[in-house]
Amino acid sequence: MAAASTSSPVISQPQFTAMNEQQCFYNESIAFFYNRSGKYLATEWNTVSKLVMGLGITVCVFIMLANLLVMVAIYVNRRFHFPIYYLMANLAAADFFAGLAYFYLMFNTGPNTRRLTVSTWLLRQGLIDTSLTASVANLLAIAIERHITVFRMQLHTRMSNRRVVVVIVVIWTMAIVMGAIPSVGWNCICDIDHCSNMAPLYSDSYLVFWAIFNLVTFVVMVVLYAHIFGYVRQRTMRMSRHSSGPRRNRDTMMSLLKTVVIVLGAFIVCWTPGLVLLLLDVCCPQCDVLAYEKFFLLLAEFNSAMNPIIYSYRDKEMSATFRQILCCQRNENPNGPTEGSDRSASSLNHTILAGVHSNDHSVV
């Protein structure tokens, strides 16, 4: 008996650990991952969950209606049939999709999370990642377009419709890939020791990558708008020395500054807290990030609600089209100019070009 017991195979502790690390948990319940990460999984609706869900649904409805209004306005008004407006329509489409994705999340959160499988949970998160990535990519595309337009002194870029379509396809391809990456393998289902606390099926490394990707995009936008501001400020100062219209130059610079502050301020307020929270989830285990998760996610979603206001409502022509649509009025002169309307790609670009072109002979 003693000899038999000595001859039986014994698995050492390092071998057991290696086998455990290679094990995958595709058939486990969502509760398994949540319990292991320490994230609370509700069994019933409490006051906070109901409040978050109510706010979330309200924001979703506003996002979808506001962005639908933008898309309809660009479609019905032929003055908007230019590349910049096509990008704005695509931004509205991305934000509309964000509203749908977040709406789906609202009905599959809280106690309803327990009913999800691994695949449906990854789908739920993938929709959010795809929609938000598409929105951010569109913001970057618009910033690049504005940069090119201002530096070439054009009302509209000379980009062909085909190139606009290519840009839009690239944006959505990148967004879909970013949203699908966790589902196709970059998750912690087979690496259970490196699961995130905020997203218990997501790998820590993916969340760090996603957060840094968006923060880098933010930095690029800051650089682009800062470059535009510096360029216009230099031009207005040169024009002030050679022209009798310093007030117009000052107004142009202030209009640009206001737009830059709105754009960057909205992005900082809506996105930075959530992105920092993702990094803290990985880099600061003792930080109680789960206490703020839902509210910061809701705040990030507000960016999709603010985009139509920032990029569309400041345009006088867009505002007039909004009123016509909401009041069921016909646009009697869809091709002609409207007095007092801003027919440029944005009111910002129109004021820049108006100041530059009216004084260009004195600068050169």
Curated annotation (Swiss-Prot):
Q: Which InterPro entries match?
A: GPCR_Rhodpsn, GPCR_Rhodpsn_7TM, LPA_rcpt, LPA_rcpt_EDG2
Q: Which CDD domains match?
A: 7tmA_LPAR1_Edg2
Where are the coiled-coil regions?
none
Example GO CC term: the record gives: GABA-ergic synapse
| Keyword line | Cell membrane, Disulfide bond, Endosome, G-protein coupled receptor, Glycoprotein, Membrane, Phosphoprotein, Receptor, Transducer, Transmembrane, Transmembrane helix
Q: What does the record say about its membrane topology?
A: Multi-pass membrane protein
- Give one GO biological process term: phospholipase C-activating G protein-coupled receptor signaling pathway
Q: Has the keyword Kinase been applied to this entry?
A: no
Q: Which residues cross the membrane?
A: 51-75, 84-107, 122-144, 164-184, 205-225, 256-280, 295-315
Pfam families registered for this protein in UniProt? 7tm_1
Query: From what superkingdom does this record's organism come?
Result: Eukaryota
Q: In which tissues is it expressed?
A: Detected in brain corpus callosum, medulla oblongata, cerebellum and sciatic nerve. Detected in heart.
Residues the record lists as Phosphothreonine modifications: T351
**What is this protein for, i.e. what is its function?**
Receptor for lysophosphatidic acid (LPA). Plays a role in the reorganization of the actin cytoskeleton, cell migration, differentiation and proliferation, and thereby contributes to the responses to tissue damage and infectious agents. Activates downstream signaling cascades via the G(i)/G(o), G(12)/G(13), and G(q) families of heteromeric G proteins. Signaling inhibits adenylyl cyclase activity and decreases cellular cAMP levels. Signaling triggers an increase of cytoplasmic Ca(2+) levels.
Can you tell me which family this protein belongs to? Belongs to the G-protein coupled receptor 1 family.
Spell out the PANTHER family in the cross-references: G-PROTEIN COUPLED RECEPTOR (PTHR22750)
Name the record gives this protein:
Lysophosphatidic acid receptor 1
